[in-house]
Amino acid sequence: MAVASQRRTIQFAIALGACCALSALGFLGAQSAPPRETARVSDRRIVRTVPDRLPQMLPPARAAGSWPSFRGSEASGVAEGQNLPDKWNVRRGENILWRTTIPGLAHSSPVIWGDLLFVTSAVSSNPAATFRPGLYGDGDASDDRTRQRWMVYALDKRTGKILWERVAYEGQPIDKRHIKSTYASATPATDGRIVVAWFGSQGVFAYDVNGNLRWKVDLGRIDVGAYDIPSFEWGPASSPIIWNDLVILQCDTQADSFVIALNVQSGETVWKTPREELPSWGTPTVVTTSAGAMLVTNASNFIRGYDPQTGRELWKLGGSSKITAPTPVFKDGLFVIASGRQPEGPIFVVRQNAKGDVTLAAGKTNSEAIAWSRIARGPYMPTPLIYRGLVYVLNNNGIFDAYNLGTGEEVYRQRLPNIGSGFSASPVGADGKIYLSSEDGEISVISAGTKFTQISTNDMGETLMATPALSEGVLYARTAKNVFAIGRKK
């Protein structure tokens, strides 16, 4: 492979907030009914373990302030009615409601249901284990192969008190991780009765909200890394989502890629759809369209739309980057799906009625199915934000763009000041403001609208890789060592 090609490949530094899976432990348990499978998958093992039978749980009503998975409901990143402060000061405690130290390393984001906040972490037996933030081209794996404890924590979101913590898995990592990543980069998901954590090749683990293990599933090895240099193991970051009674996971690996839906209460496979894909890091999205529910995944060979009930492919779109990380988002009948690796680096805006192969013809930027597109403008890590009629695109190098959602017209392009180590966390929006979190730990508050206006910059004092969560007037920021609750003191 040419040196230039290798250099372009290793520029990927997986650090999503994010964001995958269980190792061979001789797990027991049989499925009560065969899963639907759209095509034969090779020998990948899927093994389910269920502890002593626990009662079935009815799905709760959506609790106030819920932020159930990566970037909240439908990955929108938006929560209105928050009345958040524009400024806070960690050192002086101004507008800091609480902070709680979480051991270990993780880029996973907090998720919230009611008064419960869940986070994950991987705690190394080597207290010096770390990761390296920043804008650089190294594609090396970390030398941290020490014994880990993969943890799930439940906190009281009002006080920050740790209510329970569980060791989901303990052992030496099956795969390596990128020097910028952690062994817990996938964000958990919850529906108010179950919280699901995915730890790559270590497994998928489901607890009830009281900390009882409900089930765990071995999906086999989740080998995610450079598509053209297999020895570059970077680790997963795609996060689980819960839709109705399904836990949906996107498993794009060096071989045998697939999307799978598990029963949320039992872990049984409901459907599994194989696909020819390169490794990817984006989280899938399920939204309600005019034609019903649709599951959309971002990946290298094709961006795809599926029926989330069955896993049947509805449409596909070629032309994406060889490395994909941002999550699809949806608003006003339009999907925004993007990726930043050059030379493609596209932003695609797909109409909700897309069917079949909707790949654009050479030289075309729109079609019946594609409202508009742009090449070499996509973000590398952060997921775009659709907010109040505009699409905001934050790249890891600090370039911040705004486009008209309906037309694709560029509203502005702004280089953020003092970008430092760059950006991995995705923007979130509330009450006409946008919150941008840098790897150096600065959260900038930007006015939403057609003119770029920076209101404030707030230093968290720590590296920040995870996307914040918003709930009932509080911004929850997960830094390298702590979870912070930021809000107006009453």
Give the role of each language-model region.
Residues 2-17, 22-490:
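Noncatalytic, solvent-exposed loop/strand surfaces
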